[in-house]
Amino acid sequence: NLYLGYAVAALFALFLLVVLLIVIKELSAFARLGRIDRIQHAAETALASADLTAARTVIKDLTGLYAGRDDTKWGRDRLKDREADMFDASALIALADHELLGPLDAAARREVEAAARQVATVTALVPLALADVVAALGSNIRMIRRIAEIYGGRSGTLGSWRLTRAVLSHLVATGAVAVGDDMLEPILGGSILGKLSRRFGEGLVNGALTARVGVAAIEVCRPLPFAPGKRPSVRSIIKTALSGLVTTKSR
């Protein structure tokens, strides 16, 4: 049947078009993530060698990455006005860090706090162990994707898995995998921990793990390395995200 043949050919062409669009999207996502990696490594090299010319190239690439984004326009304008006055690589990169990435860091931190609170709540309230594992995994993957988007690394499906693998590798490399009472007690207090139910305690531990994953994701996705002492404190994030839950539970 001629018409049936045309219909099959049209469906096949449509299928190929969809596949092509997906491939283009994934390649674009990989390219975007790779661009952030290159800027981050170039910034580390410029700082290590105190190379002002290399630092200016980093700033040019960084402003290009965020060109067209309304949430960075004010920072880009301030950076443009002041960068000519900087004659030191570390000072120039610190200026870009403050003006461009400061608001993005705050947004990323809010994402981590929200995800940690959500995971802790779901673990505490859902009695099925497998269900809370699935919920925690989904929350962590969404959090990593959102953090990547905040810093300009739009990730597709394959890009998300690559990013997740990079975050987990970073966690292992920095030894920030485990968390338990020794981490929570200085933050929430030993007397409070002793009053919590087992399930609620598990929720706090899972929330704390999510916070650590979030901080690792920020370090991986951020186009500039953190200056010494500027890295987000996992403990402060845990305290902000989970202390309200503990207060509610302990009443």
Predicted features and spans:
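Small-residue-enriched, tightly packed secondary-structure blocks
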Residues: 98-214
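Membrane-spanning helices that line or support transport/gating and their immediate boundary helices
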Residues: 22, 26-30, 150, 212, ...
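Membrane-proximal, non-transmembrane interface segments of integral membrane proteins
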Residues: 27-119, 124
